[in-house]
């Protein structure tokens, strides 16, 4: 599924054999480096903050990636834009679905307006 997502809309065949999980029954995961993977750190921060912050993080991320794909940002500016958007927002802890949609829309508009 990951390969299909990365090569969408085409379905590129892998030159490697499929992983047989009945044979490879043990996988090891390392703790992620949150300094290197700043967006993951920001996602953890949004979850820890709670309330409407995850919706803000999502909205900012969508705009940051879109702006990167348009050539408006460098890859390394993506987490900076997300962080600036999250820092500018006042979280609601009692919220409705409408509040989540508004938070996402606010973050999208704010992230679109930020200049580097």
What are these regions (language model features)?
Residues 1-116:
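Catalytic, metal-anchored helix/loop core of enzyme active sites in primary metabolism
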């Amino acid at each position: 599924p990951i390969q299909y997502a990365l090569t969408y809309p085409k379905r590129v065949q892998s030159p490697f054999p499929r992983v047989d999980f009945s044979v490879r029954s043990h996988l090891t995961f390392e703790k992620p480096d949150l300094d290197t993977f700043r967006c993951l750190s920001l996602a953890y921060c949004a979850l820890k903050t709670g309330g409407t912050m995850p919706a803000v993080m999502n909205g900012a991320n969508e705009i940051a990636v879109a702006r990167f794909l348009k050539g408006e940002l460098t890859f390394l500016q993506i987490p900076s834009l997300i962080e600036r958007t999250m820092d500018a927002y006042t979280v609601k802890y009692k919220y409705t679905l409408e509040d989540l949609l508004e938070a996402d829309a606010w973050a999208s508009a704010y992230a679109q307006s930020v200049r580097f």
